[in-house]
Amino acid sequence: MTTRIDLGRLDGAGAEHEAAPGPGPGPGAGAGRESADPRRVRVSRRAAEALGRRLESPMPWQVARRTGPDRTLDGSMRPAPVPPHDPDDTTDPWEELGGLGLVDASGRLFPELPGALDVLARPETAVDLDLVVRRPTTGAAPVAAPGDGAGPGGSTDVQLRAWHRRRAGRVTAVATAGAQVEIGWFDDRSWAAELARVAAVTSALAPTPPARDLTLPHELMLGVGVARRTDAPRLTEELLRRHLPHMRVPEGADAREQVQLLHSGVVGRLRAVVSGQGDDGRRKVGWVSWLLFSDGWRTLRPHVDSGVSQVGVHHVEPSALGREVARLVAGVAS
């Protein structure tokens, strides 16, 4: 079972996302206007859902449960994760929200909240992010790849889900990890930095990574992954025999070894799915796929070369996520 984690801590080395403010901004702050600076508040699942009911803006996991299962990063199917709640916690959600300054004694909400949750419910563009990072643990339970739960060599997977919704220059983001829910809202000029914040993780695990730039046939990349999960070495050999001539690796690198390292060295995965309505009224979808290694992220860029479906595997920094998402946002809106 996948371990879900504190929003502020994403790996065994103690790497942290930027901390959200403790107490909320208070009903008097920013009244009558929307702040250009990102605002974030962390609440329980109960409190987040109470806000959603009050404003008729359901939380993303509630929508996902109604629309069916979600595809995980490793291609398997499972229901979209629902943030857990402590059954022994009897705190009234409105008392919790009041303590954060998000509702006053008369029941009036912090002025920016209705607009933020309206963007969440009625966006022009949606970005769903799924992040899985492998970290060390004391136990050992061999599993193939991040996204499956327990991992090889005494490791386990930690997961963060985030939903970003944009409309008319404003973005509302909801993220879940464990029992915590973070709700944020900001001007879309801050969006690239907020996306980079999601990808700003590392892992304390340090398997040998592949080269920073590779190109290989799509069938080879997927097929070797299947062969490894099903313990089919003959299939691996046949795929290598057929596709190695089409690989491009740095000078001096061994292509066969690079294929193996591309799978054995993975310590995390990130997927961003972008959707929106185009000028022709049709719903359009695009996606970004990244793999995390001990020396950083690689983006996967599919393309066709001389009639062969290929995947470029290239090193990127977390800041590149904003650029890749922006390109897709422009595409789905056209």
Regions found by a protein language model. Name each.
Residues 171-241:
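Surface-exposed beta-loop interaction hotspot
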Residues 251-334:
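Extended, charged low-complexity segments
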Residues 96, 100-127, 237-264:
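Negatively charged, low-complexity tracts enriched in Asp/Glu with abundant Ser/Thr
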Residues 2-22, 26-98, 102-108, 115-121:
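Short, amphipathic alpha-helical interface elements at domain boundaries
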Residues 54-58, 100, 123, 201, ...:
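Surface-exposed polar/charged interaction patches
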Residues 90, 100, 104-193:
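Accessory beta->alpha helical hairpin/"wing" motif in late/C-terminal subdomains of nucleic-acid enzymes
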Residues 40-44, 106, 213, 225-229, ...:
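Intrinsic-disorder-associated interaction segments
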Residues 67-82, 133-159, 277-284:
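Intrinsically disordered, low-complexity coil segments
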